[in-house]
Amino acid sequence: YKGQTPVVCVGPYVLRNSFTDTELQVATRSAFERQTRLSTEGDEQYEKRVKNGVSINNLDRFSYFFSRAYVIILSTFLALFIIVPFLAPILYKTGHKTSANIIYKVYHVICHQLAFRSFYLFGEQPYYPRELANINGVITYEQVVGSSSIDLEYARAFIGNNMIGYKVAICERDVAIYGSLALFGFIFQLTKKKIKQLPWYLWFIIALVPIAIDGFSQIPGLSSNWPAWVPIRESTPVLRIITGTLFGVGTGWYMYPMMEESMKETRVTLHRKFAIVNKLNQTKKLVDHETSL
């Protein structure tokens, strides 16, 4: 209750801080009148709420558990989500091509998997960018495939070989996004969820704008059917990692504290319910014991 005590809850009515005996009597009488009216009307939803309010079910237990462990659950899921794409080239290298292809196909749903925008394992280089990226001292994608034209469908399906290595199942930017989002989640948990929410306008400036500029400015470079005045560019692996990390960290910084506010309300509500139900059960046991004497 954020220090606003004492607090008295009488049915749907809540009295905070200093309140008079009259206010308490009015709230109690109103709650009883409301209970009588709803019971007389035979409101089924009310009866269900009353029954649910004096019992603890599995959904309550799961909701309470999830409200406490949601950061670890989501961050662990994201960590596994980012690890699996790296298993694809490992499996391909070790001869388990069927398993590797399943991973490639599953992640194809969420990622373009363009060969010139992906990382590689077990090859001469960790990436093979397009010539348009103007990165000196690296083998380009065009040199690998032996063609100066870009076939997008072929680039998506291209996995690699023993010489250049095998492609990770998601692109460079997605690796940075999901990896940094998972990392921020673990950091948020280690700080006991005390990191304050990033304002939406800072999220927009820090997280969204850079990735939008870097990503959308590459679109003309995928086709030759653009006017001459349209700038043609290709981003670099470093820029993709930077903008992806900014988006992942910024989104986690904005999202997790906001989720914590909602989860905190859930924990308080359920903790109060558990306390009430336990008190009712103790009272019932005491009454039953005294009755049996």
Predicted regions and their residues:
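N-terminal signal-anchor transmembrane alpha helix
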Residues: 68-98
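Short, highly charged, low-complexity non-transmembrane loops/tails of multi-pass membrane proteins
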Residues: 263-292
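Hydrophobic alpha-helical transmembrane segments
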Residues: 169-188
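Interfacial helix-loop-helix junctions of multi-pass membrane proteins
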Residues: 163-167, 214-247
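Extracytosolic (periplasmic/ER-lumenal) interhelical loops and adjacent juxtamembrane/interface segments
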Residues: 93-170
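Cytosolic juxtamembrane amphipathic/interface segments immediately preceding
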Residues: 52-67
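Hydrophobic cores of alpha-helical transmembrane segments in multi-pass inner/ER membrane proteins
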Residues: 179-182, 243-261
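Non-catalytic, surface beta->alpha helical segment in thiol-disulfide oxidoreductase systems
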Residues: 9-40
